[in-house]
Amino acid sequence: MINRIKISQVIVAEGRDDTTNLKRYFDVETYETRWSAINDQDIERIQRLHELHGVIVFTDPDFNDERIRRMIITVIPTVQHVFLKRDEAVPKSKTKGRSLGIEHASYEDLKTALAQVTEQFKNENEFDISRSDLIRLGFLAGADSRKRREYLGEQLRIGYSNGKQLLKRLELFGVTLAEVKEAMTKYSI
């Protein structure tokens, strides 16, 4: 039997199946966004939960859930974040469909992700990465730039970012140039 770890913050998740899987392994309260149907009332509720308990945004590694994450960050920049790697969110059975989701993640993958909670970076003056650094490292130009960004997002557990958003995402989480270089040391095509 798994010893359920207590999580004091409220986790914002996409739906009922995500909540079910999280509660299977953790003592946690969740707020479900009902897929991508987040509205102003949801944002107000999440803001209230954040004031009372703290909030961790833990959404699926797909486009719609990144949209939800951005909507929440815009209004509540101090929320915490957890990211699953895409391969950790893939259904283990072919009968479960092809969607990515927290509902498919194992206990070990969820525990690893939750152990790496991140917050928005607060001191922009210390951010040391430039657009030219990203070009030089092959994140914005080149045949494998998308794969490089995917790999980096997984290694740093900050989620995928397209070329236009990568610099902003790295700054958001206070990632240093040294951390980027370290994360990419094991990258191979």
Curated annotation (Swiss-Prot):
It is an enzyme of class 3 (hydrolase). Mg(2+) 2 binds at residues 60, 62. Residues 8-91 form the Toprim domain. GO terms for molecular function: metal ion binding; ribonuclease M5 activity; rRNA binding. Mg(2+) 1 binds at residues 14, 60. One of its GO terms (cellular component) is cytoplasm. Its cofactor is Mg(2+). Keywords: Cytoplasm, Endonuclease, Hydrolase, Magnesium, Metal-binding, Nuclease, Ribosome biogenesis, RNA-binding, rRNA processing, rRNA-binding. It is found in: Cytoplasm. It comes from the Bacteria. One of its GO terms (biological process) is rRNA processing. Binds two Mg(2+) per subunit. Its EC number is 3.1.26.8. It catalyses: Endonucleolytic cleavage of RNA, removing 21 and 42 nucleotides, respectively, from the 5'- and 3'-termini of a 5S-rRNA precursor. Required for correct processing of both the 5' and 3' ends of 5S rRNA precursor. Cleaves both sides of a double-stranded region yielding mature 5S rRNA in one step. NCBIfam families: 5S_RNA_mat_M5 (TIGR00334). Belongs to the ribonuclease M5 family. This is Ribonuclease M5 2. The lineage of its organism: Bacteria, Bacillati, Bacillota, Bacilli, Lactobacillales. The gene is rnmV2.
